[in-house]
């Protein structure tokens, strides 16, 4: 993973045409779009008000959570979880599959899903952050990314996975 993150661009955004000068300039429109869609789905009775409330509380803290600038536009997988890691003989990582939302971004964006499914059990996020460093508010950023990603998936696919979403809205 670190090898992927070592691929850099001078701009943030889509791998084919990164065009944003900062990570927040890239991420905030996505954040606003997902939040607006979530509010509408909640008003229509399709999304729990508790989820939108958690999003509102997180959004109120956005400037604080993301106060430390991201200087490096790193290539990220965008959907990295334990199910997308290919492992060969001797438990050697042989590849990654399903690079949904691959882009030049905050490298920590790639880490939030390591705390989903069974990923936390393997200490993948903790190991990466200890080895390569973490931003000052990495834990809060990862929770923010996770919440927005799960709601984004609901907006696109219409399905929530309770054992992933429930810890995010507490």
Q: Positions of the model-derived regions?
A:
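Active-site Asp-x-Gly
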Residues: 72-76, 81-140
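Helix-rich C-terminal or lid/interface subdomains of diverse kinases
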Residues: 32-35, 112-170
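Alpha-helix N-cap/helix-start and coil->helix boundary motif
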Residues: 17-24, 28, 82, 101, ...
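Residues that line or immediately flank small-molecule/substrate-binding pockets and catalytic motifs
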Residues: 8, 89, 100, 146-149
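An alpha-helical support segment within catalytic cores of ATP-dependent transferases
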Residues: 3-78, 88
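Hydrophobic recognition helices of helix-based DNA-binding modules
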Residues: 1-8, 150, 154
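Short, surface-exposed, charge-dense and proline/glycine-enriched linear segments
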Residues: 36-53, 78-83, 101-107, 155-160, ...
């Amino acid at each position: 993973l670190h090898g992927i993150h070592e691929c850099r661009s001078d701009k943030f955004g889509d791998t084919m045409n990164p065009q944003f000068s900062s990570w927040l300039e890239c991420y905030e429109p996505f954040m606003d779009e997902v939040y607006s869609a979530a509010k509408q789905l909640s008003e229509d009775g399709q999304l729990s008000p508790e989820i939108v409330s958690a999003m509102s509380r997180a959004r109120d803290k956005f400037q604080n959570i993301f106060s430390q600038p991201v200087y490096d536009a790193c290539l990220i997988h965008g959907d990295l979880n334990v199910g997308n890691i290919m492992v060969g003989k001797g438990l050697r990582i042989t590849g990654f599959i399903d690079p949904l939302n691959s882009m030049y971004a905050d490298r920590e964006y790639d880490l939030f899903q390591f705390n989903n499914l069974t990923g936390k059990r393997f200490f993948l996020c903790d190991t990466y952050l200890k080895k390569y460093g973490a931003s000052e508010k990495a834990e809060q950023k990862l929770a923010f990314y996770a919440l927005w990603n799960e709601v984004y998936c609901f907006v696109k696919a219409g399905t929530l996975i309770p054992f992933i979403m429930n810890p995010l809205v507490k």
